[in-house]
């Protein structure tokens, strides 16, 4: 009996099939035999695959559906890649997941890595069918692609192999990931970014290097990956979870997290799949063309990006059709419900599907996403108790920092009206004192020396000022172009060569503060660290544009995009990066990019972001007209009340904190051993982890103490000014500078931290 009934899928693009499918079926069967995949023994007896297994799984059909336009030779190559990756997955399962052999699994993966060679390097002799297949495919593919593509493909292939160890470790511990951890890790282990690289091969259209790391292209790949993986999890739950004992499946993850039935969890996974596909469409049709026009990309490169996006869309449609037909999956009735082949083709044909049922989930989700009322009276949201296992530590220099911080803000002009903005001062002195950012700095960087604490306080003040100023200066007028110009100016005040003096004259407190902070921060840093910290600041500032854009559209963000962008708008990388400055030269390059430390940091970041959204809910929703709040995003996505949404966000924060503790107890010691760090470097990394504890406990304490989130304070601050002879109505983006019955002197833009 099937575990659940498959939900109604959002299918906005028709599947098509490549005419060379029969040729590739014959070719890939012979290729797999030649590589040794059809006579590899399984430890429990029998073979990993035999000829019948490969025939009924029909990977040639998968590739014919997912790459409908490529020629026969290319389809053969693509099909062989998929045969290889599925063989790797099944061989790894048989050899190591069932046996729990972590050491053997690591050796197996390390052996495969040696076959991803650079120009002029000779691979070793293969010791098994997976190595033989990879050596052959590398020789047939990589010489025809650019160095940039090779670099990206090595990374995605590395991830899908290496992160199999994460799955194996969770199986051994009988541990099911939390939803956020699962989405992040599934991208790495699930292989869809790898599939996106092969779309470039099949389409003969490489993504231009200058766009490969941009937000639109990254979102295209991430939404594609998430949709592919979520769809696969729905179809494969029966086999993976009920029959094979896997625990890396989104249906199982949500079933456990929400304590709901399998059917309810499947419906939630499908809702998330729909949301990710809608974001893919928005990004492909709006953000990506706008970026190409802004960068002045030549027509040929624009065509390549369009072909890549269309290839990803074809993959989604074809991948669904294959899942609906393959013997590998639970799919009773799915093929008939998918609508079959045919229909109009190409990006943007979602309105021309013959069956309304195939687009109805998307229409329902899109309408709810844009239906948020303005300034609803939500009242205070009780958000305690928050799980916090770490003690609070406070700097002895707090009082000095408080005195210093307000003087610095005054000197930078942050407490005065900025000419040309059309609004009053972003803050007055009492606003700044009520914020008490020095108190926050004294806890998140509790071990800082006096001058370091001053610097940390000033960075918090600068980031919070900018986050307030953007909606006030640019939001109410919807002047997104002016916001973009301001954003483009800010990097001028962060020169990588600190000896250069060609920055323009600062035009406002935001620029003046950044110029001052950069001189005080970047001077002692190594060039690599300086570049990394500069990127962290830029990422935060650019995320403010994303918020303005969503406000202009009155669009409540997709939950996955919100969580990932919230880390940026919160300035998480920037504030965490400040704590690394003193120890930058004492650790090996690249260690902060390992899965262990990135997962440790993102778990901490999400905890902090969620607690901020819980405490600031009334302030942001009722008084500022925000759409960027995790409680609201949860309300909107799940169509639940605010108390239910609050409880879910509290549970998510706890899950991320428990993951943080899990990594501290297991992943961090393994990382230190694997990198063979000396005592000094070990002390730096463990000190960094300790600092993250201070960071989270300090942010929680600051929110508990800070006036700005308390209902009485908010009502007083936003009360009508009796001196005003007129009332101000909501006007434009975020309405942060225009409240009903509130004077411009009392209406302050939303602090997002």
Where do the language-model regions lie?
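Alpha-helical, largely C-terminal catalytic domains
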Residues: 1-753
């Amino acid at each position: 009996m099937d575990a659940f009934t498959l939900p109604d899928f959002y299918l906005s693009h028709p599947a098509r099939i490549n005419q060379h499918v029969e040729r590739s079926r014959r070719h890939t069967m012979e290729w797999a035999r030649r590589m040794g995949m059809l006579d590899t023994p399984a430890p429990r007896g029998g073979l990993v695959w035999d000829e019948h297994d490969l025939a009924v799984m029909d990977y040639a059909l998968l590739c014919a559906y997912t790459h409908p336009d490529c020629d026969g030779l290319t389809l053969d190559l693509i099909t062989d890649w998929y045969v290889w990756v599925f063989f790797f997955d099944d061989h790894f399962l048989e050899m190591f997941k069932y046996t729990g052999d972590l050491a053997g699994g690591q050796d197996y993966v390390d052996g495969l890595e040696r076959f991803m060679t650079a120009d002029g390097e000779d691979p070793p002799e293969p010791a098994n069918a997976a190595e033989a297949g990879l050596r052959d495919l590398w020789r047939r593919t990589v010489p025809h692609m650019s160095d940039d593509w090779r670099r990206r493909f090595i990374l995605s292939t590395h991830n899908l192999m290496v992160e199999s160890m994460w799955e194996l470790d969770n199986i051994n511990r009988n541990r099911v990931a939390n939803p956020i951890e699962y989405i992040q890790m599934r991208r790495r282990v699930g292989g869809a970014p790898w599939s996106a690289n092969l779309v470039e091969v099949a389409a003969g259209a490489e993504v231009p290097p200058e766009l490969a790391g941009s937000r639109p292209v990254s979102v295209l790949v991430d939404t594609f990956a998430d949709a592919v993986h979520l769809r696969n999890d729905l179809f494969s739950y029966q086999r993976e979870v009920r029959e094979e004992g896997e625990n890396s499946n989104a249906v199982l993850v949500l079933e456990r997290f929400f304590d709901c039935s399998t059917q309810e969890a499947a419906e939630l996974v499908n809702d998330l799949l729909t949301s990710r596909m809608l974001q893919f469409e928005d990004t492909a049709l709006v953000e990506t063309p706008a970026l190409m026009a802004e960068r002045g990309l030549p027509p040929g490169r624009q065509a390549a990006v369009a072909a890549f996006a269309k290839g990803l869309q074809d993959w989604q449609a074809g991948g669904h059709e294959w899942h609906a037909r393959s013997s590998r999956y639970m799919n009773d009735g799915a093929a008939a419900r998918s609508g079959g082949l045919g229909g109009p083709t190409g990006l943007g044909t979602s309105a021309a599907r013959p069956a309304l049922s195939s687009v109805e989930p998307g229409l329902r989700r899109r309408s709810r996403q844009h239906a948020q009322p303005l300034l609803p009276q939500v009242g205070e949201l009780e958000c305690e108790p928050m799980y916090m296992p770490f003690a609070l530590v406070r700097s002895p220099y707090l009082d000095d920092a408080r005195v210093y911080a307000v003087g610095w803000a005054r000197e930078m002009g942050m407490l005065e009206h900025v000419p040309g903005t059309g609004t009053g001062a972003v803050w007055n002195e009492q606003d700044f004192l009520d914020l008490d950012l020095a108190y926050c700095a004294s806890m998140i960087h509790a071990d800082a020396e006096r001058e370091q604490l001053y610097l940390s306080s000033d960075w918090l003040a600068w980031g919070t000022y900018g986050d307030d100023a953007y909606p006030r200066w640019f939001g109410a007028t919807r002047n997104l172009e002016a916001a973009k110009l301001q954003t483009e100016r800010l990097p001028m005040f962060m020169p990588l060569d600190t000896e250069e003096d060609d920055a323009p004259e600062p035009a406002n407190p935001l620029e003046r503060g950044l110029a001052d902070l950069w001189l005080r921060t970047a001077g002692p840093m190594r060039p690599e660290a300086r570049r990394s910290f500069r990127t962290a600041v830029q990422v935060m500032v650019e995320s403010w544009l994303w918020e303005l854009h969503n406000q202009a559209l009155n669009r409540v963000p997709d939950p996955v995009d919100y969580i990932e962008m919230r880390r940026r708008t919160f300035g998480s990388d920037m504030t965490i990066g400040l704590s690394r400055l003193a120890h930058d030269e004492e650790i090996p390059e690249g260690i902060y990019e390992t899965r262990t430390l990135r997962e440790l940091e993102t778990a901490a970041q999400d905890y902090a972001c969620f607690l901020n959204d819980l405490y600031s809910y009334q302030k942001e929703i009722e008084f500022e007209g925000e759409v960027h709040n995790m409680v609201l995003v949860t309300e909107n996505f799940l169509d639940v009340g605010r108390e239910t949404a609050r409880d879910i966000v509290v549970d998510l924060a706890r899950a991320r904190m428990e993951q943080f503790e899990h990594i501290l107890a297991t992943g961090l010691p393994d990382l230190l051993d694997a990198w063979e760090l000396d005592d000094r470097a070990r002390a730096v990394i463990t000190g960094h982890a300790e600092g993250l504890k201070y960071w989270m406990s300090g942010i929680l304490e600051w929110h508990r103490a800070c006036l700005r989130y308390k209902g009485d304070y908010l009502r007083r601050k936003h009360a009508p000014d009796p001196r005003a002879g007129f009332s101000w109505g909501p006007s434009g983006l975020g309405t942060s500078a225009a409240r009903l019955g509130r004077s411009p002197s009392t209406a302050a833009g939303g602090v997002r931290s």
